[in-house]
């Protein structure tokens, strides 16, 4: 067994406590590649922000769990090389769907895991979550649970409809499971197509689609039930229209891709929401830069030539999210 502490990683307990008290949210960025890891670390160091590096089941299948673990260890050392004496980096399993996968990640150096039992009945979700919590807490690994279902498709996570979290269930769920944080459903959605055009209104000035607002009334009720308890938002990419436009300009086909408006995420970050997950925006930033590079340099074939601008574009996006949306900059240590 490898402890996350041997890798220089931290769990989420203290950083969430500080985030809730400070009215900001910790960025949780998914990564699959070295370039994503480098961009995340560079952005976190430059903004003096704690950061959560997330690995989905699909990422583990693509890049191998052991390799990703050592990439996370490398991220800690890389942050130090960049001048950060005490980086606060979490290696988190995103959407673990079984006790076995959570245990495997805990045993392999992950400092935080999510057990997603949201597709189960209330009692089954409690039982599965508690089983993971009981194992994880033996090794000081923190556990995120989920109550409510997000719509959308991203990696292996798929649901046709969302089911909002019921505030009346959260006290019993948190108490009986002992989870450290709770992912809720208040209108966010996985993927780059978070809403259909029929669900949106059209801005008369810009002509852009405007998605429906998040259910902040449900969030407020949950905060009343669980004061100070760490809340998590999944599916929170904003799907920047400039990146979508670049992709479409250079041969892509992403019609009506739409995300969560950043002003709504800013509002959420000032509440008990202390972790906000962002994945699709990174994919869009990477894809836009690569498509543009090949259009402008059709003779290039060295991966470094097109992955370098992709890395820079992702870093720019990560810094924007940290500083302008989540407010976690300057909160390291």
Regions found by a protein language model. Give the residues of each.
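Generic N-terminal amphipathic, Lys/Arg-enriched alpha-helix
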Residues: 1-27, 300-301
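C-terminal alpha-helical cap/extension of soluble enzyme domains
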Residues: 2, 248-249, 260-333
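A short N-terminal beta->alpha junction/helix N-cap motif
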Residues: 3, 24-32, 59, 305, ...
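Alpha/beta enzyme core
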Residues: 10-21, 34-59, 65-86, 95-230, ...
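Short catalytic-loop micro-motif centered on adjacent basic/acidic residues
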Residues: 26-30, 91-92, 114, 231-233, ...
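An acidic- and aromatic-residue-enriched active-site/binding cleft used to recognize and process polar
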Residues: 148, 236, 281
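Short catalytic/ligand-gating loop segments at beta-alpha or beta-beta junctions
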Residues: 233-239
């Amino acid at each position: 067994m490898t402890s996350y502490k041997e890798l220089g990683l931290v769990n989420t307990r203290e950083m969430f406590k500080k985030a809730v008290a400070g009215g900001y949210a910790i960025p949780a960025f998914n990564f699959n590649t070295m370039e994503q890891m480098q961009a995340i670390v560079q952005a976190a160091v430059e903004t003096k922000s704690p950061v959560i590096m997330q690995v989905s089941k699909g990422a583990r299948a693509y890049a191998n769990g052991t390799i990703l673990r050592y990439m996370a260890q490398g991220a800690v050392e890389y942050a130090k090389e960049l001048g950060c004496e005490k980086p606060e980096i979490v290696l988190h399993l995103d959407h673990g769907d079984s006790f076995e996968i959570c245990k495997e990640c805990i045993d392999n150096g992950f400092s935080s895991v999510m057990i997603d039992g949201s597709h189960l009945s209330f009692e089954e979700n409690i039982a599965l979550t508690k089983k993971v919590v009981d194992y994880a807490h033996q090794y000081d690994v923190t556990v995120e649970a989920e109550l409510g279902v997000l719509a959308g498709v991203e990696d292996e996570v798929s649901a046709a409809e969302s089911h909002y979290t019921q505030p009346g269930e959260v006290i019993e769920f948190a108490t009986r499971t002992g989870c450290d944080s709770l992912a809720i459903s208040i209108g966010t959605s996985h993927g780059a197509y978070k809403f259909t055009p029929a669900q949106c209104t059209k801005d008369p000035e810009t002509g852009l689609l405007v998605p429906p607002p998040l259910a902040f009334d449900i969030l407020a009720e949950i905060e009343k039930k669980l004061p100070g308890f760490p809340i998590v938002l999944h599916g929170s990419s904003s799907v920047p229209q400039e990146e979508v436009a670049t992709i479409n300009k250079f041969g892509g086909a992403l019609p009506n891709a739409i995300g969560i408006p950043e002003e709504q995420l800013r509002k959420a970050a000032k509440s008990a929401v202390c972790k906000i997950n962002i994945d699709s925006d990174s994919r869009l930033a990477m894809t836009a830069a690569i498509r543009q590079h090949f259009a402008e340099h059709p003779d290039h074939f060295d991966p470094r030539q097109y992955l370098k601008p992709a890395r820079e574009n992702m870093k720019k996006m990560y810094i924007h999210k940290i500083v302008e949306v989540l407010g976690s900059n300057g909160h390291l240590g």
